[in-house]
Design a protein with these regions (language model features):
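Thiol-/selenol-based redox modules, centered on thioredoxin-like
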Residues: 117-175
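Short active-site neighborhood of thiol/selenol oxidoreductases, capturing the structured segment around
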Residues: 14-45, 149
């Protein structure tokens, strides 16, 4: 958690810099995935980032977006494009560049978006999707991440704590 990453807001930050008293939420994201930015038929998840960030702040939980799309770094996921996208979307939270997809590989992140929620002791307590709006067969809407934040705030166990991550694959550099 001490590795330093280039940030669209500051020169560089580590996950330790961002973590707060009650934990840390890491969301692997990017600038182009339809699951992140949306389509005509699907709203995408990035419009939820700022409200979730504010909810996490109130619960004293750190919140960060990570772009690990090293395979697209020369184009749509370049650091300059990340800065432009963060400004366009008015991101309030840090948006970090994961060079060579090192963090994504270490955390076994698969998709954008992919959520990892760590408690105050750095234990993974929740991972997967932000919610279930992608599932056309859902019986009811479930806001997984906001429910997890609320559970931590209320001193309760996070349920469900592991859900399927839906999104675009992280574009790693082939070796």
């Amino acid at each position: 958690m001490d590795k330093v990453f280039p940030s669209t807001q500051e020169s560089s930050l580590s996950l330790t810099d961002i973590k707060k008293e009650n934990g840390l939420i890491v969301i692997f994201s990017c600038n182009t995935c339809p699951f992140v930015v949306g389509t005509e038929d699907f709203p995408g998840w990035e419009n939820q980032y700022n409200p979730l960030y504010n909810m996490a702040l109130k619960a004293n939980i750190g919140f960060v977006l990570i772009n690990s799309n090293e395979g697209k770094r020369a184009g749509v996921d370049s650091f300059e494009e990340m800065k432009s996208h963060a400004k366009k979307m008015s991101y309030q939270m840090p948006y970090l560049m994961d060079e060579n997809s090192e963090l994504a590989n270490a955390m076994e992140a698969k998709t954008t978006p992919h959520v990892f929620f760590f408690d105050k002791n750095n234990k993974l307590i929740c991972a997967g999707s932000i919610d279930n709006i992608w599932d056309n067969k859902r019986k009811k809407d479930e806001q997984y991440l906001s429910m997890a934040i609320q559970s931590v705030l209320n001193g309760k166990k996070v349920k469900p704590n592991f859900t399927a991550a839906k999104g675009c694959s992280i574009k790693r550099v082939s070796k």
